[in-house]
Amino acid sequence: MAEICYRAKITHTEKTVEQLYKMQYYVYEKLRMLLRMLLGFGLVLAAVVTDIPNWGKALLLLAGAWLLVSKDFPAAVRADRALSERKARLPNMNYSFGPETVHLSGEGSMDIPYGKFTRLVEDKQYLYLFVNRNSVCMMEKDSVKPADIMAFAKFMEDKTGLKWRAEKPFLSMSIYDLRQALRDMRGK
């Protein structure tokens, strides 16, 4: 690989794998989250307004409340499945950012051209470079070297043509977020 502009890494743990799957779910499954929430609300409402036996109301309330409070349950299930398949063999990933590609090394190695990335997302601790809904490069913010995270963010925006976005709480979704959720559902 040519000149290295930046380096980053992550040492995966159960916590980071769970966070990775949760972020994939938050980024690509907003519509599913909305539908789960609406279904949960509908079940709770049905329990309150319908004239059915108390045991039926209790079941509706239980199911509705569970759907409302377990918004990222599908992500947790996927993370548990991935952790079980790996049987505690979690990868250490190293990223080298060159002029044209990102070089990944860890369990294997590959180069990803910057044009292949579709989303740049950050949270308090990690950066996520999405290629698609099933492929993401996750790295710790404090592992980026040289340690100027703002310069790195600008570098990635310039190379990919994308803007960074911080994943927002579900209830602060905008019309743009709903439009993007519909596009994600259609695979665009």
Predicted feature residues:
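N-terminal membrane-targeting/pre-transmembrane regions
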Residues: 1-43
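Phosphoinositide-dependent membrane-docking surfaces
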Residues: 102-104, 110-127
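Short, surface-exposed beta-strand-loop junctions and turns on beta-sheet-rich folds
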Residues: 109-111, 118-120, 134-137, 145
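A membrane-cytosol interface segment of integral membrane proteins
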Residues: 128-188
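Generic beta-strand structural signal
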Residues: 96-97, 122, 131
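Conserved beta-hairpin
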Residues: 71-111
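Alpha-helical transmembrane spans
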Residues: 27-87
